[in-house]
Amino acid sequence: MGETDLQNGEIRDFPSFSHRGFMLDTGRKFIPYDTLVDIMLNMAYYKMNDLQLHLNDNYIFLKEHLAGKNLSPEEQLKYVLEHAKTGFRVETDIVGKNGQKLTSDEHYTKEEMQNLIKLAKALHINLVPEIDTPGHALSFVKVRPDLMYQGSLSDYAGKHNVERVAMLDLD
């Protein structure tokens, strides 16, 4: 055989794992639409098949946010609602009574989200647009303060509640 010849044979190329992917946090750090498209094209090339888009988040660290401020609990809540930064990266028309918009300035339009879903399907990528609640729901609470939990979370800290666990019904 010459230097440019190959023997007859068979090449089988397939991934070793059924789930091959990752999560992108676009809630805290906006990733432009064109970059997401490029990422998905690269994922397909490397046979990756799962992409979770984290579309909302809070960028607050309460201790640092309230450091040096002598505020009552009510004043702390008001300060956080007025000053803490949030991200909600999907276009929506929702506006609170206070004039606060749910959608961040940097966001994906409805058309862009539909295009990402179509592209993912064509590339055999399982795209999961994820809205993280209740833990990262400050963007919702700024628009709809009535959705805010009013009880004390410290009542549950470190305690096991059989009724809450049973409610999950993991069977």
Predicted regions and their residues:
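Feature activates predominantly on carbohydrate-active enzymes
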Residues: 1-170
